[in-house]
Amino acid sequence: MKNSRFSGFQWAMMVFVFFVITMALSVILRDFQATIGVKRFVFSIKDLAPFIAAIVCILVFKHRKEQLAGLKFSISLKVIERLLLALILPLIILMIGLFSFNTYADSFILLQTSDLSVSLLTILIGHILMAFVVEFGFRSYLQNILETRMNTFFASIVVGLIYSVFTANTTYGVEYAGYHFLYTFMFSMIIGELIRATNGRTIYIATAFHASMTFALVFLFSEETGDLFSMKVIALSTTIVGVSFIIISLIIRAIVYKTTKQSLDEVDPNNYLSHIQDEEPSQEDASSTSNHDVSSKDETKQQDIDNDKHQSKKPNKSDDALTTSNYKEDASSVNKETDTTHNDNIKDHSTYTEDRHSSVVNDVKDEIHEVEDHKADTDKSH
């Protein structure tokens, strides 16, 4: 399933409104076929109903970009591959039908052999236009909307049922209507498988298959005139090819899944085994889970390393405290050395003062002694 921006209510309303408008317009437009003056086998005006319904829904509901996600006109290798299949599968269906006619019927009837007053080019252009407007509504819009909430396979079933109701033909009896319903349903399922995992590039593939089938049926067989055998052959041929194509596609995807050890979503998005994966996790899922755990552990380790680097850049309080204490010890030691030096200077100064004082006293004493001696000598002489 795709990621959806639609609420559940809006999703349901878009599908419901599309269905109602399509069915109502198919009844209304049918009465205007004679008015436009174009034969029904060239262009059926009723086929405009899904196109108009899609346009109305796009204009009415929000998230228009998401509504138009199924209408991309770019080309990829996968689109070219599916285009080739869209042209080959109708050939296979018609070959099976022709073989059945040659085996079980006397002949087959060319439809309207007496009334083909329109050129082949006009018929081809008309069928391409019919295929485009129908598939724009049912594939590019409706199936795209359905795939936002459900698996591609089941979305194709829903679209197939709505398309079969839209094209139902009860004019020629119940049995004929039953085979016609089977034919249109398998017709739609084949297109649903063809457009799988094309990322919105659906319109080329769906239009090519649709136009190829309807254009060939204009000339071959006689189902349009109510021939039950023709309708039965076409319905069964389409069913055989459709079932075989879906089964082969599933087998190929399963082989790729087993050989590459990928999940089916990686092999092909929106696969119809996704619900089995949810219920029964495989070994590959377990290995992918373990790989995810390992990667998450590596991410955790990397985060721890980054945190350590970040913390290493932050100032550490304990380091600051140690640095401050070291600074204090250095300052105290410097102060002690300064005090010691100052005390030594004071002691040296005091010693120098004492020495100088003692020398002065001694000189005075010597002078006194000399004076006394001189006086004594003077007295003796008198």
From Swiss-Prot:
Alphabetical list of InterPro entries matching this protein: MFS_trans_sf, Rce1/LyrA-like_dom
Superkingdom field: Bacteria
Entry keywords, A to Z: Cell membrane, Cell wall, Membrane, Secreted, Transmembrane, Transmembrane helix
Topology in the lipid bilayer: Multi-pass membrane protein
One term of GO molecular function: endopeptidase activity
Keyword set includes Cell membrane: yes
Membrane-traversing stretches: 9-29, 41-61, 83-103, 118-138, 153-173, 175-195, 202-222, 232-252
Region annotation (Disordered) ranges: 278-382
UniProt-annotated location(s): Cell membrane; Secreted, Cell wall; Cell septum
Single GO BP term: CAAX-box protein maturation
Bias (Basic and acidic residues): 294-320, 327-382
GO cellular component annotations of the record: plasma membrane
Regions of compositional bias (Polar residues) in chain numbering: 284-293
Protein task: Involved in bacterial cell envelope homeostasis. Regulates peptidoglycan processing, perhaps acting as a scaffold protein.
Family designation: Belongs to the LyrA family.
Designated name of the protein: Lysostaphin resistance protein A
